C-alpha cells in the first residue's frame, strides 16, 4: 500500500498572532453589535508590554477600544508580565480612522446601495474545502492539531495542568493513502506540542501531563501505535512566551484559520473585517458550498474557488474540483452550486447573517479555526442540500 505523510499545525489563543486576531474580532463584534452596517478593517499588533489597534472603522457604535483590548487579553490569561503580558498595565495604543470615501462610494455607495448591488470591498480570490475523512468534513491533520491546542487551553484554565501558560503550538503528521482522490487517514505519525510553562515544572512532568491530559483525550486510540513519535516541548524550555517572547500581528495564521495546508488559500486574512470584505465572507460561502457538495454525497472531497473585483457585486469566476471523487461531472456540480449560493457580498452578509456581532460571535472564530466548528454562530457550516436534476 502506497502512503504519504501530511502535516498541519495550530497555535493557542495565547500565541501573540492569535491574540491580535482575537482583539481585532472583539472590536468587530462590538461595532456590529451596536451598528450592523459598521465598516471595519481593524488590525492589531503586540510586543512586550504593548498592544496597538489601528485601521479604518466607520460606525455609529460607541466603542471603548482600550477596554476591549484589555478585557480580551485578560480573558486569554495575560494577567501578569510573568506570563508574557499584563492586561491591566500594558500600554494600549489606538490609531483608528474612517474608511476611505473612495472605497465607500465604490463598494456600498456610502450606505445607499441595496444589498444585491453592494460591491466587493476589494479584489481577491478565496477557496473553500471539504473532505469526508472526519465528521467535521475537515482534514484530520488540521482537526487534531486544532483540538490539541484547544485542549491545552482547557486544562490550563480548569487548573488540571496549573503549570501551563497561555502561549503554545501544536503540530500533527498523519500517514494517509489516496483512494481515487479521497484521503484515507491510516495513523498518526508524529505529534508535536510546544507549550509555555511556569518555572515549577520539569520536562518529564510536562511530557507525562501532555500525554495524559491533552493527547489521550483528543487523538482517537485507533490512530496511535507503538511507532507514533511524540515531540513534547523539544526545545527544552518555554517560560518566556506571549508578546514578551514574540511580536504578534493580525492575519498571520491564515492556514491555521482554514484547512491546515490542504486545499488552497487566496492569501486574505479574516479577523477584524466586516462582511463587505470578501476575504472573509467569500471564504465563508465557498466553505459552505464545498461542505454541502461532500455532505450531500456528490463527492468525497471538494474545493471551490470564487474571485472578485472591487466595487463589483457579481463574482468574476466560480470554480469547483472534486479531485475525481465526484458522483456526477464537476461541471454539473458547478451548476448546482451557482443555483444554490448567492456569491454577491451584500447577499452573503444577509444569507449567512454576517452583520450580527456580540456574544463573541467573531471573536470565537479567531482561535481554533473558522471551519468545522459545531456552533450555531458559524452559519457557514450549515449544509445546503444539492440535488442533481433527474
Curated annotation (Swiss-Prot):
Q: Reaction catalysed? A: L-methionine + ATP + H2O = S-adenosyl-L-methionine + phosphate + diphosphate
Q: Name one Pfam family in it.
A: S-AdoMet_synt_M
Which residues of the sequence carry a binding annotation for Mg(2+)? 9
Q: What is its EC number?
A: 2.5.1.6
Q: Name its co-factor(s).
A: Mn(2+); Mg(2+); Co(2+); K(+)
Q: Where does ATP bind?
A: 15, 167-169, 235-238, 246, 252-253, 269, 273, 277
Task: Show the GO cellular component annotation of the record.
Answer: cytoplasm
- InterPro entries xrefs: ADOMET_SYNTHASE_CS, S-AdoMet_synt_C, S-AdoMet_synt_central, S-AdoMet_synt_N, S-AdoMet_synthetase, S-AdoMet_synthetase_sfam
Location(s) in or outside the cell: Cytoplasm
Q: In which pathway does it act?
A: Amino-acid biosynthesis; S-adenosyl-L-methionine biosynthesis; S-adenosyl-L-methionine from L-methionine: step 1/1
Enzyme superclass (EC): transferase
**Entry note: cofactor:** Binds 2 divalent ions per subunit. The metal ions interact primarily with the substrate. Can utilize magnesium, manganese or cobalt (in vitro).
UniProt GO molecular function: ATP binding; metal ion binding; methionine adenosyltransferase activity
Q: Which residues bind K(+)?
A: 43
Top-level taxon of origin: Eukaryota
Per its record, what triggers expression of this gene product? By polyamines (PAs: putrescine, spermidine and spermine), methylglyoxal (bis-guanyhydrazone) (MGBG), and salt.
Please give a single GO biological process term from the UniProt record.
Answer: one-carbon metabolic process
Q: How does it assemble?
A: Homotetramer.
* Family membership noted in the UniProt record: Belongs to the AdoMet synthase family.
What does the UniProt function comment say about this protein?
Answer: Catalyzes the formation of S-adenosylmethionine from methionine and ATP. The reaction comprises two steps that are both catalyzed by the same enzyme: formation of S-adenosylmethionine (AdoMet) and triphosphate, and subsequent hydrolysis of the triphosphate.
- Protein name in UniProt: S-adenosylmethionine synthase 4
Instruction: List the lineage, top down.
Output: Eukaryota, Viridiplantae, Streptophyta, Embryophyta, Tracheophyta
Provide the gene name from the record.
Answer: MSAMS4
